[in-house]
Amino acid sequence: MSEDGASKCQDSIQLIDEQKQFNEKTLEYFKRCIGERDVGLDYHVISVFGSQSSGKSTLLNALFNTKFDTMNAQVKRQQTTKGIWIAHTREVQTTANTGKGVDFFVLDVEGSDGAERGEDKDFERKAALFALATSEVLIVNMWEQQVGLYQGNNMGLLKTVFEVNLSLFGHKKDKQKILLLFVVRDFTGFTPLSSLQETLTNELQAMWSELNKPAGAEGSSLDDFFDFAFTGLSHKLFKPEEFASDVAKLGDKFTDLKREDYYLSGKYHQGLPLDGWSFYADSCWEQIENNKDLDLPTQQTLVANFKTEEIANNAFEHFSTAFSKLSSSLPGPELAASMKELKDQCTKEYDNYGSRYMKAVYLEKRGELLDKIKTKFSDAIAVHMSKLFNSLVSTFQSTVAQNAACQPLSERLKVGKERVMQVFEQETSDFVALELIPSVDADASALLEKIDELAERERGKEMKAIILRAKKYQFTHTRDDIVHLLSHPQDNVWQLVMDHFDDVFRRSVLKYKLPNLGDVTDESTAYDFQLDLIEEDNYALYLKIRSNAWTILYDIIHQYLKEDNVVSILRERFESKFRYDQNDVPRLWKNEEEVDAGFKVAREHALNMLNTLSIASCDGVEIVPDVPLASDEDEAQDEQGLYNEKRFGHILTAIQKEKIIQHFKRFANVAVVEAKRSTIKSHTHIPMWIYAIIAVLGWNEFMLVLRNPLFIALMLLIVGAAYTVHRLNLWTPLATFASAAVNETTHAVKAKLRTILLDDEHPKNASSKPVESFEMQDLSVNETKENANES
């Protein structure tokens, strides 16, 4: 602050006027005096009491370099100070030099026992109460010759001070002390200061003992409420140099912290920052003026509440402005660091000013400020968490989708979950570590729940895919082979079917079989479908695949072994035994007895297979699935625990078998009849004597051919061609070709003859037509019409 500014601040202002009105511009005066400096609690308030015209203002001006108005004794002795005035100074007169640094606010209180007030002691009492409530040191200004007097040495005023102090602090456990500094003016030294101190102390103790003390303060002593100090000042006019020296020595006690008799101990301070003192003083004076009981702690609490809330609001406003510029799209650690920095700046701003007020109020408002900050942070962090949640869900889904062809789902789920939770920890740990939010457990739980939901969904898809792949493999590798086994059945056909079924099923789940199981045969633990399932769910999936396999086998067998197909199987089996021998060469029947014997064997061979195909069994034991079929999983088990509601092994009923046998017998009977006819044809042949007659009668022709070279050559060509055709097995194509050629030739000849005949008849018809023919035509036409009408 400039010297001109300091000079203006040393000029006093009226804090409370003679009309008992508090100056509302006090805070502006403080700000003008302090400027941009942060004073905080580093200031002191000094008040002065004394009789009117006793030199109070003169003392303050000399000691603190203030500029209070003083009385001009050469003109008139009258009241100079009206009400209560206050001045600011940082220049205290000391023995070394003018001390600077500490801010002093000096209150010059209207003098007592003045003619202007007369018997009106109301303001005197209220001023004393105000000074006690706001000051650290209360200077009692008196002359040496007044010591020992009652009115002259302000004993009446001091009694008022004691009474007021008792009313303020008598019932309090933690009593607010104040220093009473007795300044003996015009001290000559003839009477030692110690003697004057003893006299004053005795008078004060006597006065204290006579006071009516409030409840709870009956046994209190004067020292519980006051500390006392005494000093003497030489005559200002007669001994100006000694007066100045005494004032400087007094100033040392206000500025030198190392002195044992340093006056401004921290126990006297009101504990209010300077920016709250004016509000506090105004509130106290309002209570005093309205004659209400003044409760200083309450007033201090009100001031603390008001000022800390104001400080907190300002800090939060600055915080909100900076926070609005913060981008929520920052990565988690950066966002947390930025939030932490804003929070620290806000709390630091509040702590710098708010911590100077009552601790309880300061902490309460600090907590409210932190709650408001946390609310802001919670909203922003919630937005960040929502974006992070969606991002991590997408990351998990993409991770699970990657390498699906070469990596099992369980590993992809594990990697995806670990990656997501690692990123979540990296993105959110700083929020908790920096105490921006208490915990992210709820967000982590929600994320885990979503991941588990997605994982369960992926497991469901993969389970369906595994089931579908196994089902497709089983159907593809089972259908044709099983149908082939059934269409060409052997006596152990069902054993072959089951062997093939077991082999196909084993291969369909081979990739999921656990290695190195040794002799372990428990199928509930033999397979791992790599879906990160518990043992029970893993086994349930295995049972589902096996159930589908049994269902496929059931459908193939029962759909193929219908009545018509079984009849065909029996016919083929009958024919293979009846028409062919053991070398698969067609039989040539010689007689009916041989046909009947072969028929009996072939029929038994076929009908025995009917019994085998009617019920699926191995070694005489019906085949029963070890799991329920897919279409009847909900059917109840029988007493043996077997799922036989669908009776897997029962293929043909008795009625169906009867129908099959009837169809088979018809076919077999036809085959027998045809075989017997073939035996009859083989016995009906040309007699040998016919060949002898042909040889005798055709001898000449035969010899003619042998003697003619042309016929010999033609015969050799024909024989050679016939041999070639026979060796190449071309008789059938040759016969087909000959038949086609004959047919074409026949058609061509017929067409030619038809053309010739039509050409011959046309001229005759054109030359003349007999009358009779027309008549016959007419008759025939009429007859046709009559027949049509009759019909």
Curated annotation (Swiss-Prot):
Enzyme category, top tier: hydrolase
Region feature Disordered, mapped onto this chain: 763-791
GO BP annotation list: endoplasmic reticulum membrane fusion
Family annotation (InterPro entries): G_GB1_RHD3_dom, P-loop_NTPase, RHD3/Sey1, Sey1/RHD3-like_3HB
Subcellular location: Endoplasmic reticulum membrane
Domain GB1/RHD3-type G residue range list: 40-268
Pfam families: RHD3_GTPase, Sey1_3HB
Amino-acid positions noted as binding GTP in the UniProt annotation, renumbered to this chain: G50, S51, Q52, S53, S54, G55, K56, S57
Organism: Eremothecium gossypii (strain ATCC 10895 / CBS 109.51 / FGSC 9923 / NRRL Y-1056)
Name this polypeptide is given: Protein SEY1
Keyword DNA-binding found: no
Lipid biosynthesis in keyword set: no
Enzyme Commission designation: 3.6.5.-
Membrane topology recorded in Swiss-Prot or TrEMBL: Multi-pass membrane protein
Similarity comment text for this entry: Belongs to the TRAFAC class dynamin-like GTPase superfamily. GB1/RHD3 GTPase family. RHD3 subfamily.
Broad class of the protein's primary localization: endoplasmic reticulum
Organism placement in taxonomy: Eukaryota, Fungi, Dikarya, Ascomycota, Saccharomycotina
Cited function: Cooperates with the reticulon proteins and tubule-shaping DP1 family proteins to generate and maintain the structure of the tubular endoplasmic reticulum network. Has GTPase activity, which is required for its function in ER organization.
PANTHER family registered for this protein in UniProt: PROTEIN SEY1
UniProtKB keywords: Endoplasmic reticulum, GTP-binding, Hydrolase, Membrane, Nucleotide-binding, Transmembrane, Transmembrane helix
Database matches in PROSITE patterns: G_GB1_RHD3
Gene Ontology cellular-component annotations: endoplasmic reticulum; endoplasmic reticulum membrane
Membrane-spanning parts: 686-706, 710-730
Originating gene: SEY1
Spans within the Lumenal topological domain: 707-709
Residue ranges annotated as Cytoplasmic topological domain: 1-685, 731-791
A Gene Ontology molecular function term of the record: GTPase activity
